[in-house]
Amino acid sequence: MSEQEVKELDLNGEMLVRREKLSALRAKGNAFPNKFRRDALAQDLHNQYDSEDGEILKEKGVEVQVAGRIMTRRAMGKATFITIQDMSGKIQLYVARDNLPEGVYAEDVGNWDLGDIIGVKGTLFKTKTNELTIKTTEVQLLTKALRPLPDKFHGLTDQEVRYRQRYLDLISNEESRRTFIIRSKVVAGIREYFISKGFMEVETPMLQVIPGGASARPFVTHHNALDVDMYLRIAPELYLKRLVVGGFERVFELNRNFRNEGVSVRHNPEFTMLEYYQAYADYHDLMDNTEELLRKLAIDILGTTIVKYGDLEFDFGKPFERITLHDATVKYGADKGIVKEDLYDFDRAKATAERLGIEVQKSWGLGSIVNAIFEEVAEHHLIQPTFLMAHPAEISPLARRNDENPEVTDRFELFIGGREIGNGFSELNDAEDQNERFDAQVAAKEAGDDEAMFKDEDFVVALEHGLPPTAGEGLGIDRLAMLYANAPSIRDVILFPAMRQK
Protein backbone atom coordinates (compact mmCIF):
# COMPACT_ATOMS: atom_id res chain seq x y z
CA MET A 1 0.00 0.00 0.00
CA SER A 2 1.39 3.40 -1.02
CA GLU A 3 1.90 6.28 1.38
CA GLN A 4 -0.94 8.18 -0.31
CA GLU A 5 -3.31 5.22 0.08
CA VAL A 6 -2.43 5.00 3.77
CA LYS A 7 -3.20 8.71 4.19
CA GLU A 8 -6.55 8.34 2.42
CA LEU A 9 -7.42 5.34 4.60
CA ASP A 10 -6.58 7.29 7.76
CA LEU A 11 -8.62 10.25 6.53
CA ASN A 12 -11.65 8.11 5.76
CA GLY A 13 -11.43 6.52 9.19
CA GLU A 14 -11.23 9.85 10.98
CA MET A 15 -14.09 11.28 8.95
CA LEU A 16 -16.22 8.25 9.81
CA VAL A 17 -15.68 8.89 13.53
CA ARG A 18 -16.56 12.56 13.12
CA ARG A 19 -19.72 11.75 11.16
CA GLU A 20 -20.80 9.41 13.96
CA LYS A 21 -20.33 12.26 16.44
CA LEU A 22 -22.43 14.53 14.22
CA SER A 23 -25.17 11.88 14.04
CA ALA A 24 -25.24 11.79 17.83
CA LEU A 25 -25.59 15.57 17.91
CA ARG A 26 -28.45 15.44 15.41
CA ALA A 27 -30.22 12.92 17.62
CA LYS A 28 -30.09 15.40 20.51
CA GLY A 29 -31.68 18.20 18.48
CA ASN A 30 -30.17 21.15 16.62
CA ALA A 31 -26.66 20.13 15.57
CA PHE A 32 -25.85 23.55 14.10
CA PRO A 33 -27.07 26.22 16.54
CA ASN A 34 -26.90 29.85 15.41
CA LYS A 35 -27.98 31.84 18.47
CA PHE A 36 -24.52 32.34 19.98
CA ARG A 37 -23.37 35.95 20.04
CA ARG A 38 -19.77 36.86 20.85
CA ASP A 39 -18.80 40.16 22.42
CA ALA A 40 -15.03 40.12 21.97
CA LEU A 41 -12.27 39.16 19.53
CA ALA A 42 -9.09 37.38 20.56
CA GLN A 43 -6.64 40.09 19.52
CA ASP A 44 -8.68 42.85 21.12
CA LEU A 45 -8.51 40.98 24.42
CA HIS A 46 -4.75 40.54 24.07
CA ASN A 47 -4.31 44.22 23.25
CA GLN A 48 -6.31 45.29 26.28
CA TYR A 49 -5.25 42.77 28.92
CA ASP A 50 -1.87 41.19 28.03
CA SER A 51 -0.05 43.80 30.09
CA GLU A 52 -2.51 43.60 32.98
CA ASP A 53 -1.26 42.19 36.28
CA GLY A 54 -2.72 38.73 36.91
CA GLU A 55 -4.04 39.51 40.40
CA ILE A 56 -5.65 42.75 39.30
CA LEU A 57 -7.23 40.99 36.31
CA LYS A 58 -8.63 38.30 38.61
CA GLU A 59 -10.15 40.93 40.91
CA LYS A 60 -11.82 42.67 37.96
CA GLY A 61 -13.65 39.48 36.96
CA VAL A 62 -13.80 40.42 33.28
CA GLU A 63 -16.47 38.25 31.63
CA VAL A 64 -16.34 37.64 27.87
CA GLN A 65 -18.01 35.60 25.14
CA VAL A 66 -15.77 34.43 22.30
CA ALA A 67 -16.06 32.01 19.41
CA GLY A 68 -13.64 30.39 17.01
CA ARG A 69 -12.10 27.26 15.54
CA ILE A 70 -10.29 24.76 17.77
CA MET A 71 -6.64 24.78 16.73
CA THR A 72 -4.99 22.89 19.59
CA ARG A 73 -6.15 20.99 22.65
CA ARG A 74 -4.23 19.54 25.57
CA ALA A 75 -6.22 17.33 27.95
CA MET A 76 -5.06 17.04 31.56
CA GLY A 77 -7.54 14.73 33.26
CA LYS A 78 -10.41 16.84 34.53
CA ALA A 79 -9.37 19.91 32.56
CA THR A 80 -8.36 20.77 29.01
CA PHE A 81 -6.44 23.70 27.57
CA ILE A 82 -7.80 24.67 24.15
CA THR A 83 -6.61 27.30 21.68
CA ILE A 84 -9.24 28.80 19.42
CA GLN A 85 -8.72 31.06 16.42
CA ASP A 86 -11.05 33.79 15.21
CA MET A 87 -10.65 36.42 12.50
CA SER A 88 -8.27 38.46 14.65
CA GLY A 89 -6.02 35.80 16.15
CA LYS A 90 -5.83 33.12 18.84
CA ILE A 91 -6.65 32.88 22.52
CA GLN A 92 -6.36 30.09 25.08
CA LEU A 93 -9.31 28.56 26.94
CA TYR A 94 -9.23 26.68 30.24
CA VAL A 95 -12.08 24.18 30.20
CA ALA A 96 -12.46 22.36 33.53
CA ARG A 97 -15.07 19.79 34.49
CA ASP A 98 -15.84 21.50 37.81
CA ASN A 99 -16.59 24.85 36.14
CA LEU A 100 -19.24 23.43 33.79
CA PRO A 101 -22.71 21.99 34.32
CA GLU A 102 -22.74 18.31 35.23
CA GLY A 103 -22.00 15.97 32.33
CA VAL A 104 -21.00 18.70 29.86
CA TYR A 105 -17.26 18.09 30.15
CA ALA A 106 -17.45 14.36 29.49
CA GLU A 107 -20.30 14.29 26.99
CA ASP A 108 -19.64 17.47 25.01
CA VAL A 109 -16.08 18.69 25.45
CA GLY A 110 -14.74 15.16 25.26
CA ASN A 111 -16.15 14.80 21.75
CA TRP A 112 -14.69 17.99 20.36
CA ASP A 113 -12.10 17.66 17.59
CA LEU A 114 -9.52 19.95 16.07
CA GLY A 115 -11.25 22.15 13.52
CA ASP A 116 -14.59 22.27 15.35
CA ILE A 117 -16.06 25.74 15.86
CA ILE A 118 -17.16 26.53 19.40
CA GLY A 119 -18.55 29.42 21.42
CA VAL A 120 -17.68 29.91 25.09
CA LYS A 121 -18.41 32.24 27.98
CA GLY A 122 -16.01 32.79 30.84
CA THR A 123 -13.74 35.11 32.80
CA LEU A 124 -10.22 36.26 31.99
CA PHE A 125 -7.22 35.20 34.06
CA LYS A 126 -3.47 34.70 33.72
CA THR A 127 -1.85 31.25 33.90
CA LYS A 128 1.37 30.55 35.83
CA THR A 129 3.25 31.33 32.61
CA ASN A 130 1.39 34.67 32.43
CA GLU A 131 -0.66 33.71 29.35
CA LEU A 132 -4.02 35.43 29.00
CA THR A 133 -6.67 32.70 29.22
CA ILE A 134 -10.44 32.38 29.50
CA LYS A 135 -11.80 30.23 32.33
CA THR A 136 -14.93 28.87 30.70
CA THR A 137 -18.26 28.53 32.46
CA GLU A 138 -20.47 27.89 29.42
CA VAL A 139 -19.55 26.07 26.21
CA GLN A 140 -21.36 25.30 22.97
CA LEU A 141 -20.38 23.42 19.84
CA LEU A 142 -21.48 25.57 16.91
CA THR A 143 -20.14 23.63 13.91
CA LYS A 144 -18.83 20.07 13.77
CA ALA A 145 -15.91 19.79 11.33
CA LEU A 146 -16.15 16.54 9.37
CA ARG A 147 -12.68 16.81 7.88
CA PRO A 148 -9.53 17.12 10.00
CA LEU A 149 -7.17 20.05 9.68
CA PRO A 150 -4.15 19.41 7.41
CA ASP A 151 -1.25 17.62 9.08
CA LYS A 152 -2.88 17.97 12.47
CA PHE A 153 -2.40 21.70 11.94
CA HIS A 154 1.34 21.75 11.78
CA GLY A 155 0.95 23.74 8.63
CA LEU A 156 -0.15 23.43 5.04
CA THR A 157 3.01 23.28 2.94
CA ASP A 158 1.78 21.98 -0.44
CA GLN A 159 1.74 25.15 -2.56
CA GLU A 160 -0.82 23.88 -5.06
CA VAL A 161 -3.22 22.85 -2.28
CA ARG A 162 -2.79 26.30 -0.74
CA TYR A 163 -3.98 27.90 -3.99
CA ARG A 164 -6.74 25.42 -4.80
CA GLN A 165 -8.12 25.23 -1.26
CA ARG A 166 -7.47 28.73 -0.03
CA TYR A 167 -9.75 28.22 2.96
CA LEU A 168 -7.32 25.62 4.33
CA ASP A 169 -4.41 27.95 3.66
CA LEU A 170 -6.11 30.76 5.59
CA ILE A 171 -6.88 28.45 8.51
CA SER A 172 -3.38 27.04 8.62
CA ASN A 173 -1.01 29.86 7.72
CA GLU A 174 -0.85 33.09 9.65
CA GLU A 175 1.39 34.58 6.95
CA SER A 176 -1.32 34.04 4.32
CA ARG A 177 -3.90 35.76 6.49
CA ARG A 178 -1.48 38.66 6.96
CA THR A 179 -0.95 38.89 3.20
CA PHE A 180 -4.64 39.30 2.44
CA ILE A 181 -5.14 41.76 5.28
CA ILE A 182 -2.37 43.84 3.70
CA ARG A 183 -4.01 43.54 0.29
CA SER A 184 -7.27 44.80 1.76
CA LYS A 185 -5.43 47.74 3.33
CA VAL A 186 -3.82 48.56 -0.03
CA VAL A 187 -7.24 48.76 -1.72
CA ALA A 188 -8.79 50.73 1.15
CA GLY A 189 -5.82 53.11 1.25
CA ILE A 190 -5.99 53.78 -2.49
CA ARG A 191 -9.72 54.48 -2.33
CA GLU A 192 -9.25 56.81 0.64
CA TYR A 193 -6.41 58.67 -1.11
CA PHE A 194 -8.34 59.43 -4.29
CA ILE A 195 -11.57 60.37 -2.54
CA SER A 196 -9.55 62.79 -0.36
CA LYS A 197 -8.19 64.35 -3.58
CA GLY A 198 -11.67 65.04 -4.93
CA PHE A 199 -11.93 62.07 -7.30
CA MET A 200 -15.25 60.31 -7.91
CA GLU A 201 -15.31 56.51 -7.91
CA VAL A 202 -17.17 55.06 -10.90
CA GLU A 203 -17.94 51.71 -12.51
CA THR A 204 -17.66 51.06 -16.23
CA PRO A 205 -18.70 48.03 -18.32
CA MET A 206 -17.01 44.67 -17.85
CA LEU A 207 -18.67 43.32 -21.00
CA GLN A 208 -17.67 45.37 -24.01
CA VAL A 209 -18.50 45.19 -27.71
CA ILE A 210 -15.05 46.62 -28.49
CA PRO A 211 -12.24 45.74 -26.06
CA GLY A 212 -10.08 48.84 -25.86
CA GLY A 213 -7.69 50.70 -23.62
CA ALA A 214 -4.73 48.30 -23.80
CA SER A 215 -2.79 46.04 -26.11
CA ALA A 216 -3.78 42.52 -25.08
CA ARG A 217 -5.69 39.44 -26.22
CA PRO A 218 -9.26 39.48 -24.85
CA PHE A 219 -11.63 36.76 -23.67
CA VAL A 220 -14.59 36.38 -26.02
CA THR A 221 -18.16 35.52 -25.03
CA HIS A 222 -21.62 35.78 -26.61
CA HIS A 223 -24.64 37.75 -25.45
CA ASN A 224 -27.62 35.57 -26.32
CA ALA A 225 -30.35 38.21 -25.95
CA LEU A 226 -28.53 40.73 -28.14
CA ASP A 227 -27.05 38.00 -30.37
CA VAL A 228 -23.67 39.68 -30.41
CA ASP A 229 -20.14 38.64 -29.51
CA MET A 230 -18.76 40.55 -26.55
CA TYR A 231 -15.45 40.74 -24.73
CA LEU A 232 -14.42 40.77 -21.11
CA ARG A 233 -12.71 44.09 -20.73
CA ILE A 234 -8.95 44.35 -20.91
CA ALA A 235 -9.02 47.91 -19.52
CA PRO A 236 -11.63 50.57 -18.60
CA GLU A 237 -9.62 53.43 -20.12
CA LEU A 238 -11.81 54.49 -23.03
CA TYR A 239 -14.97 54.58 -20.91
CA LEU A 240 -13.27 56.59 -18.17
CA LYS A 241 -12.07 59.15 -20.70
CA ARG A 242 -15.62 59.41 -22.06
CA LEU A 243 -16.62 60.44 -18.53
CA VAL A 244 -13.99 63.20 -18.54
CA VAL A 245 -15.45 64.41 -21.85
CA GLY A 246 -18.81 64.41 -20.08
CA GLY A 247 -17.53 66.71 -17.34
CA PHE A 248 -16.46 64.35 -14.55
CA GLU A 249 -12.95 65.78 -14.40
CA ARG A 250 -11.51 63.47 -11.72
CA VAL A 251 -12.57 59.83 -11.83
CA PHE A 252 -11.14 56.52 -10.66
CA GLU A 253 -12.12 52.87 -10.81
CA LEU A 254 -10.92 49.88 -8.80
CA ASN A 255 -12.01 46.77 -10.62
CA ARG A 256 -11.13 43.63 -12.57
CA ASN A 257 -9.53 43.35 -15.98
CA PHE A 258 -9.22 40.16 -18.03
CA ARG A 259 -6.51 39.21 -20.50
CA ASN A 260 -6.43 35.89 -22.30
CA GLU A 261 -2.69 35.46 -21.98
CA GLY A 262 -0.07 33.51 -20.06
CA VAL A 263 0.03 32.64 -16.37
CA SER A 264 3.22 33.29 -14.38
CA VAL A 265 4.42 34.55 -11.00
CA ARG A 266 3.55 38.05 -12.29
CA HIS A 267 0.50 37.36 -14.45
CA ASN A 268 -3.01 36.09 -13.77
CA PRO A 269 -5.68 36.26 -16.51
CA GLU A 270 -8.06 37.97 -14.06
CA PHE A 271 -6.49 40.81 -12.12
CA THR A 272 -7.36 44.02 -10.29
CA MET A 273 -6.40 47.48 -11.50
CA LEU A 274 -6.71 51.04 -10.35
CA GLU A 275 -7.28 53.45 -13.21
CA TYR A 276 -7.72 57.15 -12.66
CA TYR A 277 -8.01 60.23 -14.87
CA GLN A 278 -7.38 63.84 -13.97
CA ALA A 279 -8.27 66.77 -16.20
CA TYR A 280 -5.92 69.74 -16.39
CA ALA A 281 -2.95 67.62 -15.37
CA ASP A 282 -0.06 66.02 -17.25
CA TYR A 283 2.04 62.91 -16.80
CA HIS A 284 4.47 64.70 -14.48
CA ASP A 285 1.58 65.39 -12.08
CA LEU A 286 0.67 61.70 -12.14
CA MET A 287 4.22 60.64 -11.34
CA ASP A 288 4.08 62.98 -8.34
CA ASN A 289 0.71 61.49 -7.32
CA THR A 290 2.11 57.98 -7.57
CA GLU A 291 5.12 58.71 -5.39
CA GLU A 292 2.87 60.32 -2.78
CA LEU A 293 0.39 57.42 -2.87
CA LEU A 294 2.98 54.65 -2.55
CA ARG A 295 4.74 56.52 0.26
CA LYS A 296 1.45 56.96 2.13
CA LEU A 297 0.52 53.29 1.72
CA ALA A 298 3.91 52.19 3.06
CA ILE A 299 3.58 54.37 6.15
CA ASP A 300 -0.05 53.41 6.80
CA ILE A 301 0.46 49.67 6.27
CA LEU A 302 4.05 49.05 7.38
CA GLY A 303 4.68 52.05 9.60
CA THR A 304 7.76 53.01 7.56
CA THR A 305 8.74 54.14 4.07
CA ILE A 306 11.15 51.18 3.86
CA VAL A 307 9.62 48.28 1.92
CA LYS A 308 11.45 44.95 1.97
CA TYR A 309 10.86 42.51 -0.85
CA GLY A 310 12.85 39.29 -0.78
CA ASP A 311 16.49 40.32 -0.70
CA LEU A 312 15.64 43.81 -1.96
CA GLU A 313 14.87 46.95 -0.02
CA PHE A 314 13.13 50.05 -1.35
CA ASP A 315 12.81 53.45 0.30
CA PHE A 316 9.57 55.04 -0.83
CA GLY A 317 10.54 58.13 1.13
CA LYS A 318 13.13 59.06 -1.51
CA PRO A 319 12.33 60.58 -4.93
CA PHE A 320 11.89 57.92 -7.61
CA GLU A 321 14.37 57.91 -10.49
CA ARG A 322 13.09 59.26 -13.81
CA ILE A 323 14.75 58.14 -17.06
CA THR A 324 13.69 57.89 -20.71
CA LEU A 325 13.28 54.52 -22.41
CA HIS A 326 16.03 55.34 -24.90
CA ASP A 327 18.47 56.50 -22.20
CA ALA A 328 17.80 53.41 -20.08
CA THR A 329 18.40 51.15 -23.09
CA VAL A 330 21.75 52.81 -23.83
CA LYS A 331 22.75 52.88 -20.14
CA TYR A 332 22.09 49.20 -19.49
CA GLY A 333 22.91 47.99 -23.00
CA ALA A 334 26.35 49.59 -23.21
CA ASP A 335 28.08 46.34 -22.27
CA LYS A 336 26.33 44.76 -25.28
CA GLY A 337 27.63 47.43 -27.63
CA ILE A 338 24.41 49.43 -27.88
CA VAL A 339 24.81 53.12 -28.66
CA LYS A 340 22.23 55.89 -29.00
CA GLU A 341 22.38 55.88 -32.81
CA ASP A 342 21.20 52.23 -32.85
CA LEU A 343 17.80 53.33 -31.52
CA TYR A 344 16.95 56.06 -34.02
CA ASP A 345 17.40 54.22 -37.33
CA PHE A 346 15.19 51.32 -38.40
CA ASP A 347 17.90 49.24 -40.08
CA ARG A 348 20.38 49.72 -37.23
CA ALA A 349 17.73 48.95 -34.62
CA LYS A 350 16.64 45.81 -36.48
CA ALA A 351 20.24 44.62 -36.80
CA THR A 352 20.85 45.28 -33.09
CA ALA A 353 17.72 43.37 -32.11
CA GLU A 354 18.63 40.37 -34.27
CA ARG A 355 22.16 40.39 -32.84
CA LEU A 356 20.58 40.13 -29.38
CA GLY A 357 18.50 37.13 -30.47
CA ILE A 358 15.21 39.05 -30.69
CA GLU A 359 12.80 37.76 -33.33
CA VAL A 360 11.67 40.91 -35.14
CA GLN A 361 8.04 40.69 -36.29
CA LYS A 362 7.09 41.88 -39.78
CA SER A 363 4.51 44.27 -38.34
CA TRP A 364 7.05 46.04 -36.13
CA GLY A 365 8.20 49.55 -36.84
CA LEU A 366 11.15 51.30 -35.23
CA GLY A 367 9.30 51.95 -31.97
CA SER A 368 8.38 48.31 -31.41
CA ILE A 369 11.93 47.18 -32.13
CA VAL A 370 13.40 49.73 -29.70
CA ASN A 371 10.94 48.62 -27.02
CA ALA A 372 11.93 44.97 -27.55
CA ILE A 373 15.60 45.90 -27.17
CA PHE A 374 14.78 47.78 -23.94
CA GLU A 375 12.94 44.75 -22.55
CA GLU A 376 15.87 42.51 -23.41
CA VAL A 377 18.74 44.57 -21.99
CA ALA A 378 17.37 47.11 -19.51
CA GLU A 379 14.03 46.23 -17.93
CA HIS A 380 15.40 43.80 -15.33
CA HIS A 381 17.90 46.45 -14.15
CA LEU A 382 15.15 48.83 -12.98
CA ILE A 383 15.24 47.59 -9.39
CA GLN A 384 14.81 50.75 -7.34
CA PRO A 385 11.55 52.68 -7.98
CA THR A 386 11.94 54.15 -11.46
CA PHE A 387 9.68 56.05 -13.82
CA LEU A 388 10.54 55.02 -17.39
CA MET A 389 9.47 57.84 -19.71
CA ALA A 390 9.12 58.86 -23.36
CA HIS A 391 7.91 55.65 -24.97
CA PRO A 392 7.73 55.46 -28.78
CA ALA A 393 4.42 56.64 -30.21
CA GLU A 394 4.10 53.37 -32.14
CA ILE A 395 3.61 51.37 -28.92
CA SER A 396 1.55 54.08 -27.19
CA PRO A 397 -1.56 54.53 -29.36
CA LEU A 398 -3.56 56.41 -26.71
CA ALA A 399 -0.82 58.70 -25.38
CA ARG A 400 -0.12 62.32 -26.29
CA ARG A 401 2.91 62.98 -28.49
CA ASN A 402 5.76 64.90 -26.92
CA ASP A 403 5.87 68.53 -28.07
CA GLU A 404 9.64 68.50 -28.69
CA ASN A 405 9.89 65.01 -30.21
CA PRO A 406 6.65 63.71 -31.77
CA GLU A 407 8.18 60.25 -32.28
CA VAL A 408 7.82 59.64 -28.52
CA THR A 409 4.98 60.26 -26.09
CA ASP A 410 4.41 61.93 -22.73
CA ARG A 411 4.16 58.53 -21.09
CA PHE A 412 5.71 56.71 -18.14
CA GLU A 413 5.82 53.23 -16.70
CA LEU A 414 6.65 52.63 -13.04
CA PHE A 415 9.14 49.83 -12.40
CA ILE A 416 9.98 48.43 -8.96
CA GLY A 417 12.11 45.35 -8.48
CA GLY A 418 12.46 44.96 -12.25
CA ARG A 419 8.69 44.67 -12.68
CA GLU A 420 6.18 47.03 -14.22
CA ILE A 421 3.78 48.26 -11.54
CA GLY A 422 1.99 51.07 -13.34
CA ASN A 423 1.51 52.84 -16.67
CA GLY A 424 0.38 56.41 -17.26
CA PHE A 425 0.49 59.25 -19.73
CA SER A 426 -0.81 62.59 -20.82
CA GLU A 427 -3.86 61.61 -22.84
CA LEU A 428 -4.13 62.02 -26.58
CA ASN A 429 -7.02 64.46 -27.07
CA ASP A 430 -6.49 65.14 -30.78
CA ALA A 431 -9.37 63.21 -32.36
CA GLU A 432 -7.80 63.13 -35.83
CA ASP A 433 -4.46 61.85 -34.53
CA GLN A 434 -6.31 59.23 -32.47
CA ASN A 435 -8.23 58.07 -35.52
CA GLU A 436 -4.99 57.66 -37.49
CA ARG A 437 -3.39 55.68 -34.67
CA PHE A 438 -6.41 53.40 -34.44
CA ASP A 439 -6.08 52.76 -38.18
CA ALA A 440 -2.41 51.86 -37.66
CA GLN A 441 -3.44 49.41 -34.95
CA VAL A 442 -6.00 47.83 -37.28
CA ALA A 443 -3.28 47.39 -39.91
CA ALA A 444 -1.01 45.77 -37.33
CA LYS A 445 -3.79 43.39 -36.30
CA GLU A 446 -4.41 42.44 -39.93
CA ALA A 447 -0.67 41.79 -40.26
CA GLY A 448 -0.87 39.23 -37.47
CA ASP A 449 -0.44 41.19 -34.23
CA ASP A 450 -3.03 39.56 -31.92
CA GLU A 451 -2.45 42.20 -29.23
CA ALA A 452 -3.00 45.25 -31.44
CA MET A 453 -5.95 47.40 -30.41
CA PHE A 454 -9.42 47.33 -31.92
CA LYS A 455 -10.70 50.58 -33.42
CA ASP A 456 -13.35 52.25 -31.26
CA GLU A 457 -15.10 54.74 -33.53
CA ASP A 458 -17.49 55.90 -30.81
CA PHE A 459 -14.50 56.89 -28.69
CA VAL A 460 -13.20 58.99 -31.58
CA VAL A 461 -16.63 60.65 -31.75
CA ALA A 462 -16.36 61.41 -28.02
CA LEU A 463 -12.95 63.02 -28.57
CA GLU A 464 -14.46 65.13 -31.35
CA HIS A 465 -16.70 66.69 -28.69
CA GLY A 466 -13.55 67.78 -26.86
CA LEU A 467 -11.46 66.11 -24.15
CA PRO A 468 -9.73 68.68 -21.91
CA PRO A 469 -6.01 68.30 -21.26
CA THR A 470 -6.00 65.10 -19.20
CA ALA A 471 -3.61 62.55 -17.75
CA GLY A 472 -4.43 59.00 -16.69
CA GLU A 473 -2.73 56.06 -15.04
CA GLY A 474 -3.27 52.40 -14.29
CA LEU A 475 -1.69 50.70 -11.25
CA GLY A 476 -1.70 46.94 -10.73
CA ILE A 477 -3.26 46.22 -7.33
CA ASP A 478 -1.99 42.64 -7.26
CA ARG A 479 1.62 43.68 -7.87
CA LEU A 480 1.36 46.44 -5.27
CA ALA A 481 0.03 43.90 -2.78
CA MET A 482 2.98 41.63 -3.62
CA LEU A 483 5.36 44.44 -2.72
CA TYR A 484 3.80 45.46 0.58
CA ALA A 485 3.19 41.85 1.67
CA ASN A 486 6.61 40.63 0.46
CA ALA A 487 4.88 37.91 -1.58
CA PRO A 488 6.96 36.20 -4.31
CA SER A 489 4.06 35.23 -6.61
CA ILE A 490 0.92 36.97 -7.78
CA ARG A 491 -0.96 33.82 -6.76
CA ASP A 492 0.00 34.56 -3.17
CA VAL A 493 -2.05 37.78 -3.21
CA ILE A 494 -5.08 36.57 -5.20
CA LEU A 495 -7.49 34.64 -3.02
CA PHE A 496 -8.55 32.22 -5.73
CA PRO A 497 -6.00 32.35 -8.59
CA ALA A 498 -6.53 30.70 -11.97
CA MET A 499 -5.38 27.07 -11.87
CA ARG A 500 -5.24 24.33 -14.45
CA GLN A 501 -8.05 21.82 -13.98
CA LYS A 502 -6.96 18.50 -12.51
Curated annotation (Swiss-Prot):
GO terms for biological process: lysyl-tRNA aminoacylation. One of its GO terms (cellular component) is cytosol. It is an enzyme of class 6 (ligase). Mg(2+) 1 binds at E413, E420. CDD domains: LysRS_core (cd00775), LysRS_N (cd04322). Mg(2+) 2 binds at E420. Its cofactor is Mg(2+). Pfam families: tRNA-synt_2, tRNA_anti-codon. It catalyses: tRNA(Lys) + L-lysine + ATP = L-lysyl-tRNA(Lys) + AMP + diphosphate. Its EC number is 6.1.1.6. PANTHER family: LYSINE--TRNA LIGASE, CHLOROPLASTIC_MITOCHONDRIAL, LYSYL-TRNA SYNTHETASE. Homodimer. Belongs to the class-II aminoacyl-tRNA synthetase family. This is Lysine--tRNA ligase. It comes from Haemophilus influenzae (strain PittEE). The gene is lysS.
